[in-house]
Amino acid sequence: MENLTLVAHIPRQLLALIQSSAAYEKSSGLRVADGVREFLVAASPDFLSALQEATAPDPWRFGFAIVHRIDNVVIGLCGFTGPPDSDGLVEIAYCISPDYQGRGFATEVARALVDFASSSGRVRTVCAYTLPEMNASTRVLEKCGFRKTGEIFDSENHLVWRWEKTPPRSTSNK
């Protein structure tokens, strides 16, 4: 990655971020850009419950902090909605602080997540979901080689577009 570093989340640091950006900074030594904490606070109750029970980093479950190399600040969060399923399907998700949007960072992150999934040797398909309209998120996925495969209703009964990419196969095991 050219501009960013992905740092696997340590559960206690994510719990600190839920508490406050200052608590996260004290726990991790990294500042947090405006807007990042709000993405985590809005996470599902299941994710928050799993986080409270966890003791070790798990990129498939808890993802990564997106650290801007020059500014040395967490500009977003990214990861997967869980480990690959029995069909080798994994879903990616990412968010970037409004102060850092529009600079290509989401594209850099999406590519890194696809590379991570591919290098696991366990993933056949990477998917993502967007609002059902052309926007910055759809352009990110198109740049990364995803193709729109359909429309579905999400768990909150909102129409979304489903995007998929078949990453190159790898023989390593993450």
Model regions: which residues?
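GNAT-family acyltransferases
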Residues: 1-91, 96-99, 112-116, 120, ...
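Glycine-centered recognition micro-motifs in short, flexible terminal segments and loops
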Residues: 98-108
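Conserved active-site alpha-helix within GNAT-family acetyltransferase domains
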Residues: 107, 133-150
